[in-house]
């Protein structure tokens, strides 16, 4: 990943072991590749075999391994963690959105089960391994919040509620895990060029409105988010925990 390599030392996280949950596409894939670019040994997960196989086939794929994981499955998550020799970095990117359908309580619950409870499950089950991290400055967790952690989404009440929950979960676990030497932070991406936003990108009027409101005047690229994650996992962020970092070009403050 050229931009990451130009910004950070290639050995910044040398020897560190990282797990990127939901790391086979979009923002998660960029994060996995960025962590690998700075020396980490990375495993990424995807929800289905087809997602994992597609990730492996991309020219940019830099992780050591890609495995299937349903974040709702305790046993499956334990198996993934048991296969790792150690764990220094956990990044939680697994998430779903069902725009227009989330007012159905069943769909609402499905979204929370992945986005919020899944994030908690990953943090809780990885805690013991992160506690034993010999890396400097100790174990690090980065969760994925959203600009919808801070504002409502009429078509996505489940997604918005889940991301608001991730924000408060991050702050709560930062307090709870501090005595273990584990830092817990989150990123809150804005409008990012990923497959999930493809329809918006192709809608000239709506895309122009997004860019017009964004002070930095463009869509984010996945690499923009990945750079923030690398920083939060690095020694430069050794005294940062409980932070939720917007990566939105100023959208929320405009």
Task: Identify the meaning behind each predicted range.
Residues 2-9, 151, 230, 241-254:
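Short C-terminal tail/terminal secondary-structure segment
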Residues 24-25:
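Conserved glycine-rich cofactor-binding loop
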Residues 93-98, 250:
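Conserved NAD(P)H cofactor-binding loop of Rossmann-fold oxidoreductase domains
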Residues 99-112, 210:
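Substrate-binding pocket helix/loop in short-chain dehydrogenase/reductase
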Residues 123, 162, 170:
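Active-site helix of classical SDR
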Residues 146:
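Residue(s) in the substrate-gating loop at a strand-loop-helix junction
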Residues 178, 183, 240-242:
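Short, small/polar-rich loop/turn modules that mediate ligand/substrate recognition or access, typified
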